[in-house]
Structure formats: C-alpha cells, structure tokens
Amino acid sequence: MNEDLFYDRLHQRCPGKYLLEELETSKSNDVLHASRFVCEMELVQKTNAYYCKTIVKMLLDHEWIFAKAFTIVNDGEDEIEIYDYLYEKYIKLLSTGKPDPMMKDVVRYRFDEDVKIKIEETPNLISAASTTGFRTWEAALYMGDFLIHKPLQELAPVQGQDDGKKKLNVLEVGAGTGIVSLVILQKYHEFVNKMYVTDGDSNLVETQLKRNFELNNEVRENEPDIKLQRLWWGSDRVPEDIDLVVGADVTYDPTILPDLCECLAECLALDRCKLCLLSATIRSESTVQLFSQECNKLGLKCTIVTSTEYDANNEIRAMKALQFKPLIAPIRIYKITKQ
C-alpha cells in the first residue's frame, strides 16, 4: 500500500479492520511523510471525529503492522513523533461517541488514481423528506466503476460540434448525491459538452446536489456546461439535445416505474439520444419484471450489460474498492434502447 492509497482509504471511511488487513498484507514498505500524515488525520477528524478515533486506536494497537507497511520520514521544520501524536489524539477523542444517524459526513470515493469524488452525505440515513438522495447507494458506485472501465465515448454516438470536436450531452435522472455525473465529469470532461444533473426533488437539487458540485469544483479549460435542475418524470420535459441518459438505483419503487419508463421513452424519441444506461440493485425480481414490462409496452428494449451475478471479479472489485462490505443484493446495469 502506498501513502496516497492509505489516505484515500481514510477519506472513504474504510473500516479499521479492512484497512488493517491491507496494511498487514502490503508487500511494499512505502515512505509516509509525518507532516502530511498529521494534516490528513486532522482533515478526517474535522469531518468525522468518531471514525478518526477508531483509526487512531487501531494504529496504536497494531503499531508493528503500521511500522512494517511504512517508513516514516520527517520532512518539515519540526520533527514529529507519529506515535506520540496518535496517543495525544486518542486522549483528546476518548469521549467522542458514535455519531447521530442524521450526522453529515464528507466521504471521498476513490474510483481510480485520477477519479476521486467528494460527497457530502448522511451515510446512516436511508430516507428523509420523501427522498433517498441523502446518501450514496451501491448501484451508483457500481455504475461509476463501470463507467471508469468502459470508455464513455465508446458507449454512445456523439454529434460533431461547430469547432469540429465530438462531445456528448449527458442527462442523469434521479441523481441523488450526483456521484455518477461527477465521475463522468472528472473522467471524461474533454468528451462532455453539457451535463444535465437532475432529480425530482427541487430541494435536494438546490442543496445536496449543489453542495457536492461545489466540493468537487475544479477549474479546467473548456469545462462542460453543467446544469443542476429538477426533472419530475411524467411532468417536466426532458432536454432535447441529449445523446446519453444515465441513472443509478432509480427502479426500486414499483409505483414510479411507469413514469420513469415514459421519461426514458421520451429521451429515446429524440434524434440524438440512442442509449440509456441504468444500474439497479435487485432487491425484488418482481419489480425488475415490472420495469421490463413497462419498457416493452413503450417499445423499448432492456438488456443486461453486466451484473455482479455473472461477473465475480466485478463484485469483488466493487465491494473491496468502493464500500468494503458485501453487497446487500446483486446489481445489474441495463442498456435501454428503442426496439
């Protein structure tokens, strides 16, 4: 394990037990800079003091494993004794209890060395205020992982722009925390002209989504045009200039499937849009069958592109790299096109 990966694990809230296993099995002895270690631990404490406390205790209890994985060097003006720092930190955090379920955290998800997404979320909250968009769900992480390994420009045809470059206009439906759109923008910003990031909850769009895009605001040349807006399926019209639709965990509620499928059909009726990609956690086969039936009624073809059921490597990678625990149910990615 190198130093960058170690900090990425901390900012993604990797459980201490799993982090310890990675340190113990690390075959390299990488350099760890004491001054950076202190800065990173302070950042972790600032956003999640209880998690910081559990990591500090784990490192103190297994000092020899930490020492085996890293060679600690002092590169600042003042020499820092790491274990003295950890001991003092643990004493300060001793009274810190488990966080309230409503507590917000800023989690930084690592999809690869170059794509790391910060998300402000409430990870212990399933739903509130009639929305499930306050936390990042497994299907969104799986979709992000899929898009990292399957080049966006190979997934959908693109239209030539006036400057001769070929770029996509992408629509995300049911964006929630916005992590799928953020992955696309970080990984493929040079291939994206316009990104519509939408959700049916106006309040969520104006608060949660806006906040997460602010957290990941990196100024680049020729930055895509990003639009955060409400899209209520069956009521609001879809943008007419889109090439690709993406969505994650939007098929969980059977009562909204007719409106969702109508929205997808409206998108695919546009001249430019040829493909919708949806990731779905398979909590109920009956809901999946209903989704397929609704698609069929509207002349849409629904095909499984990949699934954790059929590809053990996908499941292992998604579990180990993105959430560090078994999946609650299989996840599939569907391709929806016109029949």
From Swiss-Prot:
It is an enzyme of class 2 (transferase). One of its GO terms (cellular component) is cytoplasm. Disruption phenotype: Increases sensitivity to antibiotics that target translation and decreases translational fidelity. S-adenosyl-L-methionine binds at W137, G174, A175, G176, D199, W233, A248. The modification Phosphothreonine is found at T177. Pfam families: Methyltransf_16 (PF10294). It is found in: Cytoplasm. One of its GO terms (biological process) is peptidyl-lysine trimethylation. Belongs to the class I-like SAM-binding methyltransferase superfamily. EEF2KMT family. Present with 1550 molecules/cell in log phase SD medium. This is Protein-lysine N-methyltransferase EFM3. It comes from Saccharomyces cerevisiae (strain ATCC 204508 / S288c) (Baker's yeast). The lineage of its organism: Eukaryota, Fungi, Dikarya, Ascomycota, Saccharomycotina.
